[in-house]
Amino acid sequence: MGVKHFGARVKRLEDPALLTGRGRFVDDVKVPGVLHACFVRSPYAHARLQSIDAKAAMTMPGVHAVITASDLPEPMRSQPMPMLLPNPALAAVCTQHVLARDEVCYVGQAVAVVVADTRYIAEDAAAAVIVNYDVLDAVGDCRDAIKEGAPRAHSDLTTNVAST
């Protein structure tokens, strides 16, 4: 694309198919035997995981597995994911685990994953997984996070400051 195209109108070629219901999306592609995944995610900004009860989800027809951190093989279970782009300016390297083990540090952190025959079964089963949390103090503002005595975003770190 040359400079002459910046700011110029571009005719959209995909609209007729999409507007008439003839468009194809990745979700329209059906692969026989494919399984679907849905993550169980933390509703809390900071909490300790007390327990995960997947019994109800596992009894649902079409559910193949509910995987938690304790089900993962080593080293995925005990080691955090590697820092892909190490930066010497970081005071402490803090990468997350594939699935939360003992603590969740942000809303939406994956706690478990449900594997099922369809997306909808996986979503329903994920909703049936019962996670008990011990909610910890959290801080949601950068200015508050660096104040003396502020709750730490990650319990295993000594500060909320990643780099100076």
Task: Report residues per predicted region.
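Flexible, low-hydrophobicity surface segments
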Residues: 1-164
